[in-house]
C-alpha cells in the first residue's frame, strides 16, 4: 500500500512537471515568457503599410488625421485643389482596388530580399481592415475596395516559402465614435475595446494564426484600458499559436521599452550600445512616410549602402531589422522599392552567414581606418567593415589570434594573410582585386576562426 502511494505521488509530481506553464494576466508573469527562438534567428523582415491611405498617397499614411484631425493647411489645400467639395475620406475606399496585387509575386520578392518574416498592416489608425472583420461593417477590404481578403492571401503566399507571417494591428482608431466616446470619458469606459479592438485581435489570431503580432496605436491610454494583459495571457496559454507567437511592446502608454515580448521602443529606434533585451529596429525605405506617396523623391529614399549599414549595425547590437515599403492602391510595389529589396537580398546571399542566427560578440564594434561591426556564431567571429581602407589593410584590435587562426572573406575563395601587431592588433591584407570582382559593393565580411 505504501509503495502504491509513493508511485502515485511520483506520477502526480511528474504530471505537474510536464504540464505547460500558465501565464497570469500581469506583466511580471507575461514578461517572464521566453522569446521563441525563431525571431532572434530571423534577423531581417519586411514591413508592409497598405490601406485606404494608399489612395490619396500624399504626405503620409496619417493623411486622414492631418486633413481632418489637426487640420494641417497643406492637407486642406491638397484636398481643395484635387477633390470636389463634400468629398469624404470614406470616398477614397472604393479606389483602393488592389487590382494588380498578386500575393505570390510579393512573396517571391520578399524571399529574394532575404526576409525571414513579413509584417502586414491588418488595420492602421484609419480603422479600415484588410480582412473581412465582422466588427468593421462596410469598412473592410471584403465589403469595399478590393473585395478580397488581403491578409489571408498574403499569408498563404509567404508561408508557402517558409517565411514567418506577422500582423500589424492598431489598437486605436482616430475617428471611431466609440473610441471618441471613451476618450471623452477619460478612458474610464471601454466601449471601443469591448466592441472593436479585442474582438478583432481574437479574430485575427484564430483566423490567421500569426507568428507575430505587431501592436501599435497604444499611446493615448494605459494597458488597463486596452485589456492587454488579459489578451496576452490567452495568447500565451490557450491560443492556437501559444508556443510560437511573438509580440512587441506597444500594449499601452506605459509599456513601450518596458513590457511585452521584444522591444520597439519607438519608430526607428537605434540604440548606441548593446541592450539587455531583444529589440527590433523598424524603419521605412521612404524616410518621410510609411505608406506609399506619389510625391516621394529620390532624396527621401534610403540608399542601398545605408540600408545594409543599418542592418549590420542592428544585428551586431542584438536586434532585428524590419524594413518597410508602401505598395500603391493597385497593389504594386514600385521599382525603386523592388531594387532596394533585391540589393539587400544579393548582399545577404553572400554575407547572410554573419547575419542569420548570429549573436552579438563580446565587442560589438570598433572604428579605426574603417567602421567594423562584429557578430558571432558557432565559435566563429564575423567582422563586417563598411569602408574599404585605402591602404588595403584592415586592422582589428579586439580579436585575439592563435596559431590556428584563419581569416577569409565571405564570397571569396582562399585564406587572407594577416599579422599580429602588439599595438594595432590583427592586420589583415585585403585581396588586391578590382571592385567588379569583389563579392559585394559595400560592407564586406571577414570570417575569423580560432580566435579569442
Swiss-Prot record:
Domain of life: Eukaryota
Glycosylation sites: 227, 254, 368, 378
Class of this enzyme: hydrolase
Gene Ontology MF terms in the entry: alpha-L-fucosidase activity
Enzyme Commission number(s) from the entry: 3.2.1.51
GO biological process: fucose metabolic process; glycoside catabolic process; lipid metabolic process
Chief subcellular location: other
Reaction(s) this enzyme catalyzes, per UniProt: an alpha-L-fucoside + H2O = L-fucose + an alcohol; a neolactoside IV(2)-alpha-Fuc-nLc4Cer(d18:1(4E)) + H2O = a neolactoside nLc4Cer(d18:1(4E)) + L-fucose; a neolactoside IV(2)-alpha-Fuc-nLc4Cer(d18:0) + H2O = a neolactoside nLc4Cer(d18:0) + L-fucose
Keyword tRNA processing assigned: no
Ion transport is among the record's keywords: no
A GO term from the CC aspect: lysosome
SMART domains in the record: Alpha_L_fucos
Extent of the signal sequence: 1-17
Coiled coil: none
Protein family: Belongs to the glycosyl hydrolase 29 family.
Function: Alpha-L-fucosidase is responsible for hydrolyzing the alpha-1,6-linked fucose joined to the reducing-end N-acetylglucosamine of the carbohydrate moieties of glycoproteins.
Subunit structure comment from the entry: Homotetramer.
Protein name: Tissue alpha-L-fucosidase
Native source organism of the sequence: Mus musculus (Mouse)
Gene field: Fuca1
Amino acid at each position: 500500500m505504501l509503495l502504491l502511494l509513493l508511485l502515485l505521488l511520483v506520477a502526480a509530481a511528474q504530471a505537474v512537471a510536464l504540464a505547460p506553464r500558465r501565464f497570469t494576466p500581469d506583466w511580471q508573469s507575461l514578461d517572464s515568457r521566453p522569446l521563441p527562438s525563431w525571431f532572434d534567428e530571423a534577423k531581417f523582415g519586411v514591413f508592409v503599410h497598405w490601406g485606404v491611405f494608399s489612395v490619396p498617397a500624399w504626405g503620409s499614411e496619417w493623411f486622414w488625421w492631418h486633413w481632418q484631425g489637426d487640420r494641417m493647411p497643406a492637407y486642406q489645400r491638397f484636398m481643395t485643389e484635387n477633390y470636389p467639395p463634400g468629398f469624404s475620406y470614406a470616398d477614397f475606399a472604393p479606389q483602393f482596388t488592389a487590382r494588380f496585387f498578386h500575393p505570390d509575386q510579393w512573396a517571391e520578392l520578399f524571399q529574394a530580399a532575404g526576409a525571414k518574416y513579413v509584417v502586414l498592416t491588418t488595420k492602421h489608425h484609419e480603422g479600415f481592415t484588410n480582412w473581412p472583420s465582422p466588427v468593421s461593417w462596410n469598412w473592410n477590404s471584403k465589403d469595399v475596395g478590393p473585395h478580397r481578403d488581403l491578409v489571408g492571401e498574403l499569408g498563404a503566399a509567404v508561408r508557402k516559402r517558409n517565411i514567418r507571417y506577422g500582423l500589424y494591428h492598431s489598437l486605436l482608431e482616430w475617428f471611431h465614435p466609440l473610441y471618441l466616446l471613451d476618450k471623452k470619458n477619460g478612458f474610464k469606459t471601454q466601449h471601443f475595446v469591448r466592441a472593436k479592438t479585442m474582438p478583432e485581435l481574437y479574430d485575427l489570431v484564430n483566423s490567421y494564426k500569426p507568428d507575430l503580432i505587431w501592436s501599435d496605436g497604444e499611446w493615448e491610454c494605459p494597458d488597463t484600458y486596452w485589456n492587454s494583459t488579459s489578451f496576452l495571457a490567452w495568447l500565451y496559454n490557450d491560443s492556437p499559436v501559444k508556443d510560437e507567437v511573438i509580440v512587441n511592446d506597444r500594449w499601452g502608454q506605459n509599456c513601450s521599452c518596458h513590457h511585452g515580448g521584444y522591444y520597439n521602443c519607438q519608430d526607428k529606434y537605434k540604440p548606441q550600445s548593446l541592450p539587455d533585451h531583444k529589440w527590433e529596429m523598424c524603419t521605412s525605405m521612404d524616410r518621410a512616410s510609411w505608406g506609399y506617396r506619389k510625391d516621394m523623391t529620390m532624396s527621401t529614399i534610403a540608399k542601398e549602402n545605408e540600408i545594409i549599414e543599418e542592418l549590420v549595425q542592428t544585428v551586431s547590437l542584438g536586434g532585428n531589422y524590419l524594413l518597410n515599403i508602401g505598395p500603391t492602391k493597385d497593389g504594386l510595389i514600385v521599382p525603386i522599392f523592388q531594387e532596394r529589396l533585391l540589393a539587400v537580398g544579393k548582399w545577404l546571399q553572400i554575407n547572410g552567414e554573419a547575419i542569420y542566427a548570429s549573436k552579438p560578440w563580446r565587442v560589438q564594434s570598433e572604428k579605426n581606418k574603417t567602421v567594423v561591426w562584429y557578430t558571432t556564431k558557432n565559435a566563429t567571429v564575423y567582422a563586417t567593415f563598411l569602408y574599404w581602407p585605402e591602404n588595403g589593410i584592415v586592422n582589428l584590435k579586439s580579436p585575439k589570434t592563435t596559431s590556428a587562426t584563419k581569416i577569409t572573406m565571405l564570397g571569396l575563395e582562399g585564406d587572407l594573410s594577416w599579422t599580429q601587431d602588439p599595438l594595432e592588433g590583427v592586420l589583415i591584407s585585403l585581396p588586391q582585386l578590382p571592385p567588379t570582382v569583389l563579392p559585394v559593393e559595400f560592407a564586406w565580411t571577414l570570417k575569423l576562426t580560432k580566435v579569442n
